[in-house]
Amino acid sequence: LLYLVERQIRIVFESYQAASRLNVSRGQALEFANLARCLERMMDHVNNLTTFIIEHNEHIPRLNLTPPIQKLPLWQESLKELMLNIRTQDSHRIETARRQLKTLQTELKVYEHSIFEDEKKNRQMASSLSISESVRRLCAYSRDFGEVLLNMKLASVMAEVRDR
């Protein structure tokens, strides 16, 4: 249900009439639509992860020890920071969260490459790779989310300067 609501929010913000009714500029509405699109893509990956875990619960004990699962709390922390900054728009905090997400992405990429080195674990390799890719994509979409927030802040500052 939440997934459908997020998609509808994105569609609403892409409408110029909706922007007018919400008393936001067309540019702001497009940025909010971009935020909604990032959330929508993250939900796709979370849905994939959930489906995988439900269908392959025999892997759960081993998965808890893998870097992708261990990195999820750091991703959640960074995304939470970005979500809080929808309102506060603290550039330094947004950029710190984006840097943490980039570090997580890099570490997960290294992990994914290391999986291929041990061919004995083909089945575990496939599941670990799938989960790692989803967590890495969650980090990427969260970084995009942060970039949109920075763009929104910059537009707001530029509008203030212009209106003086």
What residue ranges belong to the model's regions?
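Cytosolic, long alpha-helical scaffolding segments
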Residues: 1-164
